[in-house]
Regions:
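Hydrophobic residues embedded in beta-strands of well-ordered beta-sheets
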Residues: 120, 125-129, 164-167, 195-196, ...
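Acidic carboxylate diad motif detector
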Residues: 54-160
Length: 393
Protein backbone atom coordinates (compact mmCIF):
# COMPACT_ATOMS: atom_id res chain seq x y z
CA UNK A 1 0.00 0.00 0.00
CA UNK A 2 1.29 3.46 -0.87
CA UNK A 3 2.21 5.74 2.01
CA UNK A 4 1.87 9.48 2.30
CA UNK A 5 3.79 11.70 4.71
CA UNK A 6 1.63 13.88 6.92
CA UNK A 7 2.85 16.62 9.25
CA UNK A 8 1.17 17.55 12.52
CA UNK A 9 2.35 20.89 13.87
CA UNK A 10 1.55 21.69 17.50
CA UNK A 11 2.51 24.30 20.08
CA UNK A 12 5.30 23.50 22.52
CA UNK A 13 6.01 25.08 25.89
CA UNK A 14 9.61 24.44 27.01
CA UNK A 15 10.72 25.45 30.49
CA UNK A 16 13.74 27.69 31.00
CA UNK A 17 16.24 24.84 31.06
CA UNK A 18 14.76 23.20 27.97
CA UNK A 19 14.65 26.50 26.06
CA UNK A 20 18.31 27.10 26.86
CA UNK A 21 19.29 23.64 25.64
CA UNK A 22 17.21 23.95 22.49
CA UNK A 23 18.62 27.38 21.66
CA UNK A 24 22.10 25.94 22.09
CA UNK A 25 21.14 23.16 19.69
CA UNK A 26 19.82 25.72 17.19
CA UNK A 27 23.12 27.59 17.40
CA UNK A 28 25.14 24.43 16.78
CA UNK A 29 22.95 23.49 13.82
CA UNK A 30 23.42 26.96 12.39
CA UNK A 31 27.20 26.85 12.83
CA UNK A 32 27.45 23.44 11.17
CA UNK A 33 25.29 24.57 8.26
CA UNK A 34 27.18 27.84 7.70
CA UNK A 35 30.68 26.38 8.06
CA UNK A 36 29.81 23.50 5.73
CA UNK A 37 28.35 25.89 3.15
CA UNK A 38 31.40 28.17 3.37
CA UNK A 39 33.76 25.20 2.93
CA UNK A 40 31.76 23.99 -0.09
CA UNK A 41 31.97 27.40 -1.73
CA UNK A 42 35.67 27.79 -0.93
CA UNK A 43 36.54 24.37 -2.33
CA UNK A 44 34.58 24.94 -5.51
CA UNK A 45 36.18 28.36 -6.01
CA UNK A 46 39.73 27.07 -5.53
CA UNK A 47 39.60 23.48 -6.81
CA UNK A 48 36.47 23.54 -9.00
CA UNK A 49 35.26 20.43 -7.16
CA UNK A 50 32.06 19.56 -5.33
CA UNK A 51 31.77 18.15 -1.82
CA UNK A 52 30.10 14.85 -0.98
CA UNK A 53 28.01 14.14 2.10
CA UNK A 54 30.67 11.73 3.37
CA UNK A 55 33.26 14.52 3.28
CA UNK A 56 31.02 16.90 5.21
CA UNK A 57 30.35 14.17 7.79
CA UNK A 58 34.09 13.64 8.25
CA UNK A 59 34.56 17.39 8.63
CA UNK A 60 31.92 17.50 11.37
CA UNK A 61 33.74 14.77 13.28
CA UNK A 62 36.98 16.74 13.01
CA UNK A 63 35.29 19.93 14.23
CA UNK A 64 34.08 18.18 17.38
CA UNK A 65 37.71 17.24 18.15
CA UNK A 66 38.87 20.82 17.68
CA UNK A 67 39.24 22.55 21.08
CA UNK A 68 37.64 25.69 19.66
CA UNK A 69 34.55 23.77 18.51
CA UNK A 70 34.33 21.02 21.11
CA UNK A 71 31.06 22.58 22.36
CA UNK A 72 29.39 21.00 19.32
CA UNK A 73 29.48 17.76 21.30
CA UNK A 74 27.31 19.22 24.07
CA UNK A 75 24.15 18.78 22.00
CA UNK A 76 22.64 15.79 20.25
CA UNK A 77 24.55 14.78 17.14
CA UNK A 78 21.34 13.92 15.23
CA UNK A 79 20.27 17.52 14.43
CA UNK A 80 23.82 18.26 13.26
CA UNK A 81 23.81 15.24 10.95
CA UNK A 82 20.39 16.23 9.65
CA UNK A 83 21.70 19.71 8.83
CA UNK A 84 24.37 18.11 6.63
CA UNK A 85 21.79 15.89 4.92
CA UNK A 86 19.45 18.80 4.29
CA UNK A 87 22.24 20.89 2.79
CA UNK A 88 23.29 18.01 0.54
CA UNK A 89 19.66 17.62 -0.58
CA UNK A 90 19.36 21.39 -1.09
CA UNK A 91 22.32 21.38 -3.49
CA UNK A 92 20.80 18.42 -5.31
CA UNK A 93 17.57 20.36 -5.75
CA UNK A 94 19.50 23.42 -6.92
CA UNK A 95 21.44 21.54 -9.59
CA UNK A 96 18.21 19.86 -10.70
CA UNK A 97 16.67 23.36 -11.04
CA UNK A 98 14.05 22.57 -8.41
CA UNK A 99 15.21 25.10 -5.83
CA UNK A 100 17.34 28.12 -5.07
CA UNK A 101 20.99 28.14 -4.14
CA UNK A 102 21.38 27.33 -0.42
CA UNK A 103 21.87 30.41 1.74
CA UNK A 104 23.60 31.04 5.05
CA UNK A 105 21.39 30.85 8.13
CA UNK A 106 20.88 33.82 10.44
CA UNK A 107 20.25 33.72 14.17
CA UNK A 108 17.52 36.33 13.73
CA UNK A 109 15.16 34.16 11.70
CA UNK A 110 13.23 30.98 12.38
CA UNK A 111 15.35 28.40 14.20
CA UNK A 112 14.82 24.65 14.00
CA UNK A 113 16.36 21.28 14.79
CA UNK A 114 15.42 17.92 13.26
CA UNK A 115 15.37 14.75 15.34
CA UNK A 116 15.06 11.27 13.83
CA UNK A 117 13.67 8.21 15.65
CA UNK A 118 16.94 7.51 17.45
CA UNK A 119 16.87 10.92 19.15
CA UNK A 120 13.34 11.19 20.56
CA UNK A 121 10.73 9.21 22.42
CA UNK A 122 7.02 9.85 22.80
CA UNK A 123 5.70 9.04 26.26
CA UNK A 124 2.52 9.83 28.14
CA UNK A 125 4.22 12.70 29.98
CA UNK A 126 5.47 14.43 26.83
CA UNK A 127 8.19 14.41 24.19
CA UNK A 128 11.63 13.26 25.31
CA UNK A 129 14.50 14.60 23.19
CA UNK A 130 18.11 13.44 23.23
CA UNK A 131 20.25 15.08 25.93
CA UNK A 132 17.28 16.56 27.78
CA UNK A 133 16.51 15.72 31.40
CA UNK A 134 12.77 16.40 31.32
CA UNK A 135 9.97 15.88 28.75
CA UNK A 136 8.95 18.75 26.49
CA UNK A 137 5.34 19.77 27.06
CA UNK A 138 3.22 19.98 23.92
CA UNK A 139 -0.45 20.68 23.28
CA UNK A 140 -2.02 18.14 20.91
CA UNK A 141 -4.69 19.71 18.67
CA UNK A 142 -6.39 16.60 17.23
CA UNK A 143 -8.58 14.97 19.92
CA UNK A 144 -9.71 12.20 17.55
CA UNK A 145 -6.11 11.14 16.82
CA UNK A 146 -3.98 9.36 19.41
CA UNK A 147 -0.44 10.70 19.16
CA UNK A 148 0.96 7.59 20.87
CA UNK A 149 -0.20 5.41 17.97
CA UNK A 150 1.12 7.61 15.14
CA UNK A 151 4.76 6.39 15.26
CA UNK A 152 6.38 9.59 13.85
CA UNK A 153 9.54 9.12 11.81
CA UNK A 154 10.88 12.57 12.62
CA UNK A 155 10.13 15.55 14.83
CA UNK A 156 11.13 19.14 14.14
CA UNK A 157 11.43 21.54 17.07
CA UNK A 158 11.28 25.17 15.96
CA UNK A 159 11.13 28.64 17.45
CA UNK A 160 9.57 31.48 15.48
CA UNK A 161 10.91 35.07 15.60
CA UNK A 162 7.82 36.05 17.60
CA UNK A 163 8.88 33.70 20.41
CA UNK A 164 6.42 30.86 19.81
CA UNK A 165 7.68 27.28 19.99
CA UNK A 166 6.39 24.46 17.81
CA UNK A 167 6.92 20.74 17.34
CA UNK A 168 6.15 19.15 13.98
CA UNK A 169 5.60 15.39 13.80
CA UNK A 170 6.28 13.73 10.43
CA UNK A 171 4.14 10.61 10.12
CA UNK A 172 3.96 8.07 7.28
CA UNK A 173 0.35 6.96 6.89
CA UNK A 174 -1.54 4.82 4.42
CA UNK A 175 -2.75 6.59 1.30
CA UNK A 176 -6.29 7.79 2.15
CA UNK A 177 -9.27 6.56 0.17
CA UNK A 178 -10.27 8.99 -2.62
CA UNK A 179 -13.35 11.14 -2.21
CA UNK A 180 -16.45 10.03 -4.12
CA UNK A 181 -16.85 11.66 -7.54
CA UNK A 182 -19.27 14.58 -7.72
CA UNK A 183 -19.32 15.06 -11.50
CA UNK A 184 -18.38 18.74 -11.34
CA UNK A 185 -15.40 20.66 -12.75
CA UNK A 186 -14.29 24.24 -12.24
CA UNK A 187 -11.93 26.82 -13.67
CA UNK A 188 -10.27 29.24 -11.25
CA UNK A 189 -9.14 32.72 -12.32
CA UNK A 190 -6.90 34.21 -9.63
CA UNK A 191 -6.79 37.95 -9.15
CA UNK A 192 -6.04 40.84 -6.80
CA UNK A 193 -9.32 42.70 -6.37
CA UNK A 194 -10.98 39.33 -5.85
CA UNK A 195 -8.80 36.45 -4.79
CA UNK A 196 -10.49 34.06 -7.20
CA UNK A 197 -13.40 33.95 -9.63
CA UNK A 198 -14.84 30.53 -10.45
CA UNK A 199 -16.35 29.38 -13.71
CA UNK A 200 -19.57 28.77 -11.75
CA UNK A 201 -19.87 32.55 -11.30
CA UNK A 202 -18.78 32.51 -7.66
CA UNK A 203 -16.43 35.22 -6.46
CA UNK A 204 -14.06 34.67 -3.55
CA UNK A 205 -13.16 38.07 -2.07
CA UNK A 206 -9.58 38.95 -1.26
CA UNK A 207 -9.38 39.29 2.54
CA UNK A 208 -6.31 41.57 2.29
CA UNK A 209 -4.78 40.44 5.56
CA UNK A 210 -1.78 42.74 5.31
CA UNK A 211 -3.98 45.77 4.73
CA UNK A 212 -5.94 45.08 7.92
CA UNK A 213 -2.76 44.90 10.01
CA UNK A 214 -0.70 47.49 8.15
CA UNK A 215 -1.45 50.43 10.43
CA UNK A 216 -0.49 48.59 13.62
CA UNK A 217 2.57 47.09 11.94
CA UNK A 218 3.85 50.51 10.90
CA UNK A 219 3.37 51.83 14.42
CA UNK A 220 5.43 49.00 15.91
CA UNK A 221 8.11 49.37 13.24
CA UNK A 222 8.47 53.09 14.05
CA UNK A 223 8.92 52.22 17.72
CA UNK A 224 11.52 49.63 16.77
CA UNK A 225 13.46 52.22 14.76
CA UNK A 226 13.70 54.44 17.86
CA UNK A 227 15.07 51.71 20.12
CA UNK A 228 18.78 51.57 20.84
CA UNK A 229 20.55 48.72 19.10
CA UNK A 230 21.48 45.90 21.44
CA UNK A 231 19.07 46.96 24.17
CA UNK A 232 16.49 44.71 25.82
CA UNK A 233 13.72 47.09 24.76
CA UNK A 234 14.76 46.67 21.13
CA UNK A 235 14.65 42.88 21.48
CA UNK A 236 11.16 43.07 22.98
CA UNK A 237 9.94 45.47 20.30
CA UNK A 238 11.45 43.32 17.56
CA UNK A 239 9.43 40.39 18.89
CA UNK A 240 6.26 42.51 18.75
CA UNK A 241 6.91 43.31 15.09
CA UNK A 242 7.50 39.62 14.39
CA UNK A 243 4.24 38.80 16.15
CA UNK A 244 2.36 41.20 13.87
CA UNK A 245 3.88 39.57 10.80
CA UNK A 246 2.99 36.15 12.20
CA UNK A 247 -0.65 37.18 12.58
CA UNK A 248 -0.78 38.19 8.93
CA UNK A 249 0.94 34.99 7.82
CA UNK A 250 -1.26 32.75 9.95
CA UNK A 251 -4.47 34.47 8.81
CA UNK A 252 -3.45 34.17 5.15
CA UNK A 253 -2.52 30.52 5.52
CA UNK A 254 -5.80 29.75 7.28
CA UNK A 255 -7.73 31.40 4.44
CA UNK A 256 -5.77 29.50 1.79
CA UNK A 257 -6.28 26.18 3.57
CA UNK A 258 -10.03 26.67 3.90
CA UNK A 259 -10.44 27.85 0.30
CA UNK A 260 -8.34 25.04 -1.21
CA UNK A 261 -10.07 22.39 0.92
CA UNK A 262 -13.50 23.64 -0.14
CA UNK A 263 -12.60 23.48 -3.85
CA UNK A 264 -11.12 19.98 -3.57
CA UNK A 265 -14.23 18.69 -1.84
CA UNK A 266 -16.65 20.25 -4.34
CA UNK A 267 -15.02 19.52 -7.71
CA UNK A 268 -13.48 16.52 -9.44
CA UNK A 269 -11.24 18.62 -11.65
CA UNK A 270 -9.82 22.07 -10.90
CA UNK A 271 -8.24 24.15 -13.66
CA UNK A 272 -5.82 26.96 -12.82
CA UNK A 273 -3.41 29.12 -14.79
CA UNK A 274 0.35 28.65 -14.64
CA UNK A 275 0.98 32.16 -13.35
CA UNK A 276 4.49 33.60 -13.53
CA UNK A 277 4.39 35.06 -10.03
CA UNK A 278 8.13 35.80 -9.95
CA UNK A 279 7.81 37.89 -13.11
CA UNK A 280 4.60 39.59 -12.01
CA UNK A 281 6.06 40.88 -8.73
CA UNK A 282 8.62 42.84 -10.72
CA UNK A 283 5.80 45.30 -11.36
CA UNK A 284 6.45 47.75 -8.53
CA UNK A 285 2.86 48.97 -8.41
CA UNK A 286 1.44 45.45 -8.01
CA UNK A 287 4.25 43.58 -6.23
CA UNK A 288 2.92 44.14 -2.74
CA UNK A 289 -0.65 43.15 -3.59
CA UNK A 290 0.46 40.05 -5.51
CA UNK A 291 2.78 38.91 -2.71
CA UNK A 292 -0.04 39.31 -0.21
CA UNK A 293 -2.34 36.98 -2.16
CA UNK A 294 -0.22 33.85 -1.76
CA UNK A 295 -1.00 32.40 -5.20
CA UNK A 296 1.98 30.05 -5.17
CA UNK A 297 1.12 28.66 -1.74
CA UNK A 298 -2.52 28.28 -2.80
CA UNK A 299 -1.54 26.25 -5.87
CA UNK A 300 0.73 24.02 -3.79
CA UNK A 301 -2.12 23.37 -1.34
CA UNK A 302 -4.52 22.56 -4.14
CA UNK A 303 -2.11 20.10 -5.72
CA UNK A 304 -1.25 18.06 -2.65
CA UNK A 305 -4.82 18.03 -1.32
CA UNK A 306 -6.19 16.99 -4.70
CA UNK A 307 -3.63 14.20 -4.96
CA UNK A 308 -4.69 12.81 -1.59
CA UNK A 309 -8.40 13.14 -2.38
CA UNK A 310 -8.19 11.53 -5.81
CA UNK A 311 -9.00 14.81 -7.57
CA UNK A 312 -7.26 16.48 -10.52
CA UNK A 313 -5.56 19.85 -10.63
CA UNK A 314 -4.83 20.83 -14.23
CA UNK A 315 -2.44 23.70 -14.89
CA UNK A 316 -3.18 25.62 -18.10
CA UNK A 317 -0.41 27.28 -20.10
CA UNK A 318 0.29 30.82 -18.91
CA UNK A 319 0.13 32.17 -22.48
CA UNK A 320 -3.37 30.89 -23.08
CA UNK A 321 -5.49 34.07 -23.68
CA UNK A 322 -8.32 33.10 -21.35
CA UNK A 323 -9.57 36.67 -20.90
CA UNK A 324 -9.59 37.53 -24.63
CA UNK A 325 -11.35 34.39 -25.86
CA UNK A 326 -15.13 34.20 -26.00
CA UNK A 327 -16.22 31.08 -24.12
CA UNK A 328 -19.39 30.87 -26.24
CA UNK A 329 -18.06 30.94 -29.81
CA UNK A 330 -14.26 30.91 -29.41
CA UNK A 331 -13.70 34.37 -30.93
CA UNK A 332 -10.23 35.66 -30.06
CA UNK A 333 -9.82 39.40 -29.56
CA UNK A 334 -6.84 41.25 -30.90
CA UNK A 335 -6.39 43.11 -27.60
CA UNK A 336 -8.09 43.65 -24.27
CA UNK A 337 -6.90 46.31 -21.84
CA UNK A 338 -6.54 45.47 -18.15
CA UNK A 339 -9.03 48.18 -17.25
CA UNK A 340 -11.81 46.55 -19.27
CA UNK A 341 -13.93 44.48 -16.89
CA UNK A 342 -16.80 43.71 -19.32
CA UNK A 343 -16.86 43.28 -23.08
CA UNK A 344 -19.22 42.14 -25.81
CA UNK A 345 -18.10 39.48 -28.27
CA UNK A 346 -18.20 40.84 -31.86
CA UNK A 347 -18.63 37.29 -33.13
CA UNK A 348 -21.77 36.16 -31.29
CA UNK A 349 -22.82 39.24 -29.31
CA UNK A 350 -22.42 37.59 -25.89
CA UNK A 351 -21.70 40.02 -23.08
CA UNK A 352 -18.87 38.83 -20.85
CA UNK A 353 -17.61 39.53 -17.38
CA UNK A 354 -13.85 39.45 -17.90
CA UNK A 355 -13.02 37.23 -14.92
CA UNK A 356 -15.92 34.78 -15.25
CA UNK A 357 -15.19 34.39 -18.96
CA UNK A 358 -11.53 33.67 -18.17
CA UNK A 359 -12.50 31.09 -15.53
CA UNK A 360 -14.83 29.33 -17.99
CA UNK A 361 -12.09 29.22 -20.61
CA UNK A 362 -9.65 27.82 -18.05
CA UNK A 363 -12.15 25.07 -17.21
CA UNK A 364 -12.55 24.24 -20.91
CA UNK A 365 -8.79 24.28 -21.49
CA UNK A 366 -8.26 22.00 -18.49
CA UNK A 367 -10.62 19.49 -20.08
CA UNK A 368 -8.61 19.62 -23.30
CA UNK A 369 -5.39 19.07 -21.35
CA UNK A 370 -6.84 15.93 -19.80
CA UNK A 371 -8.11 14.74 -23.19
CA UNK A 372 -4.68 15.34 -24.72
CA UNK A 373 -2.93 13.47 -21.88
CA UNK A 374 -1.28 16.53 -20.45
CA UNK A 375 -0.43 18.33 -23.69
CA UNK A 376 -0.13 22.12 -23.64
CA UNK A 377 -3.20 24.13 -24.49
CA UNK A 378 -2.98 27.26 -26.63
CA UNK A 379 -5.29 28.40 -29.41
CA UNK A 380 -3.96 28.02 -32.94
CA UNK A 381 -2.67 31.49 -33.75
CA UNK A 382 -3.07 30.85 -37.47
CA UNK A 383 -6.75 30.02 -37.31
CA UNK A 384 -7.82 32.12 -34.33
CA UNK A 385 -10.31 34.77 -35.32
CA UNK A 386 -9.33 38.27 -34.38
CA UNK A 387 -11.29 41.48 -34.57
CA UNK A 388 -12.30 44.68 -32.84
CA UNK A 389 -13.87 44.59 -29.40
CA UNK A 390 -16.86 46.35 -27.91
CA UNK A 391 -15.54 47.31 -24.48
CA UNK A 392 -17.65 48.24 -21.50
CA UNK A 393 -15.74 49.69 -18.56
Amino acid sequence: MDCVRTAYKVRAYPDTEQATMLRRTFGCVRVVWNRTLADRQRRYTIEQQGTSYRETDAALTAWKRDPELEWLGEVSSVPLQQALRHQHAAFGAFFAKRGRYPRFKSRHGRQSAHYTRSAFRMKTDGLWLAKTATPLRIVWSWPDIDLMTLDPTMVVVSCEPDGRWFVTFAVDTADPAPLPAVGETVGVDLGITEFAVLSTGERIPNPRHMGRHERGLKRHQRRLARCQRGSNNRAKQKQKVARRHARVRDARRDFLHKTSTDLVRRFDRIGIEDLNVAGMVRNRSLARAISGCGWGEFRAMLEYKAQRAGRQVVVVDRWYPSSKTCNSCGHLLASLSLGTRHWTCPGCGTRHDRDINAAKNIDTAAGLVVAASGGPVRPDQATGRRGPVNEEP
